[in-house]
Amino acid sequence: MRRALWMCGNPSADGGTLSRGAAAWLRDDDAQAETLTGGFAGWVEAEHPLVRPEHLPVRDALGRTTWVTRARPKIIRVACPWLIRRFIDPTARFLFVAPTEVQGVADRFKATPFDTGHGFWNDRGEHCTFDVMLSAFGLETQPLLRLAEIVRGADTDRLDLAPQCAGLLAASLGLSRMYRDDIAQLNAAMVLYDGLFRWCRDAADETHG
């Protein structure tokens, strides 16, 4: 069964008649549809992230964004795809290729390069590509900023930035040894980052007991 969440696009909308009517229509079409309590206004009031559209890449005929980066990812080239799929484009495609092939693949497949050493989506000073994406897309919420510090420390060997940096580095290197296929590695790492984000959001002050 298909799943859908309907939310009014009007910034002042409270998830009223239009949302509930559309959800009912979708349920009649055999979709599992829900409405967001409070609508767009409720989302904003709760200070949930809103993606800035000005840096969104061009989408393909199926509505997907396509990204390309260097093969054999470890930290950033896994963390950024996680961020994109969870907060920007859940259908995004990622192409992992040899460093010398990144630009050619980007041109041929209309893909957006990231973490390649040059271009817009790359490290800037002490900020890694993950930091750049948070800022450019307007996703600088407290949980994601906490996660960014962990990612930055693991990626740059500044393991003193947060106690969790060493753990993320160890788990990431372990995954890179477990999987020869980059997409399989990315898919396996998604749950790792899901758990780490959930800790950043809800459980940072909780103990194992």
What are these regions (language model features)?
Residues 1-8, 14-74, 80-81, 108, ...:
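Rhodanese-like catalytic fold shared by cysteine-dependent sulfurtransferases
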Residues 93-103:
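A short beta-strand-loop structural module common to alpha/beta enzyme folds
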Residues 88-90:
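A charge-rich, low-complexity, intrinsically flexible signal that marks solvent-exposed coils, linkers
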Residues 76-77, 186:
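Active-site-proximal structural scaffolding
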Residues 11-12, 97:
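Short beta-strand segments
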Residues 136-209:
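A charged, amphipathic interaction segment
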